[in-house]
Amino acid sequence: MNEPVEAKTMVIEGWVEDYALKNALELYKRDHYKHLIITGLPLVHFEDYVMFPSTAAAAAAVVRKLGFKDSIYEAVIPKTVFIDRTYNTGVATRMIMSKHPDWGRSFNIYSVGVHSRRTHLMFERAFGSDYNIGIIADTDHSFDPEHWWHTSIGFRNVSNEFVAWIYVSAFFHPTYSDFKRKLEIGYYTDSINKERKEEDAFFADSAKSPLEKDSLKDFHGLSWYPIKYKYRVMAKFDLDTVNPVFEMATNTARKPEYRIYGHVIFKIHDTLCKLTVYQNINLKNDPQWGNYLFIPFRDKTNGFTTHAAGRYLDIEKPVSDSVIVDFNKAYNPYCAYADRWSCPLVPIENRLPVAIKAGVKEYK
């Protein structure tokens, strides 16, 4: 299937083989394309041992090796998305293109073989009638397309795609906004999981770990609540910097200087909650941490599934009267891991009347 349209954007399906990537680049240069998007799936099998996080990243590396110098945009679906992946890559591609209205509303998909017809239809469903979408199908070298029924792989590919195309044509009528929302939550979940893996790696590093040296041999990762998007709350932010600097109590004789910077007000479990936000005076000019604010808090899980003395959150300084407070990122004070640390105690006004089943759990 070859039905290209006049366009300056090429979308390459990231699963295609190297010969197709090479052919696509030759066409990209010949027809003077300006923008390149590569779609792909996350590589979830043996992910700790593979070089690339997705098929799009792997394809992009091949494209770079072939001498491509322009920007490459990767439309990769999250690890949490397991169904309707071709349509979801279409939604992910649309999310990229919506950020670049100057690219226009036309593009060509570069695919391989019989799958290209269904890809084209899926992308048309994802983009709607406002976009003009073309398709360029390279030859599938795994079987003879003129005699596809002579081999098992040819028969399987053609028959499967034929049935799938009928299904999409007759029965698949998705709502773009619903799929976009699922992708956004999936990207968020992937980002939190990535941060948690990095945190585990930090704790396992003997040169950096807050754990005692003799505890490292028994460390197999921190324990976390499952990631739940509902614990990423939009809060009202009230700036309040009129109070003087004060010495915050810790579990030791140390008295670090803080000031109240404001308050966040939000609802969780249908309960109105309020937390005071603090600024560390010693860090306010620090290039890494100067733009962050500190929220120590306690909730109904403390002493049961989370650290008895409470947990912490950091947020960037709000630039408006609202801010995201993400309890999935709640972390323990270092005192939860070793007695040698000095940690701020949670002020009494920051005790929540609800259970926050999010973030890190008690270390055992």
List the model feature ranges, each with a label.
Residues 167-179, 354-363:
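Short, low-complexity, Pro/Ser/Thr/Gly-rich segments in the mature regions of secreted, periplasmic
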Residues 294-331:
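Acidic, glycine-rich flexible loop segments
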Residues 231, 246-249, 322:
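Terminal leader/tail segments of proteins
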Residues 150-177:
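A transmembrane-helix-recognition feature enriched in membrane-embedded lipid enzymes
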Residues 330-364:
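Extended, aromatic/histidine-rich regions of cofactor-dependent oxidoreductases associated
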Residues 39, 64-74, 86-89, 96-102, ...:
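Mid-length scaffold segments of soluble, non-membrane domains
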Residues 1-150:
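A structural signal for short, hydrophobic/glycine-enriched beta-strand patches
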Residues 2-33, 180-229, 233, 241-242:
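Start-of-domain marker
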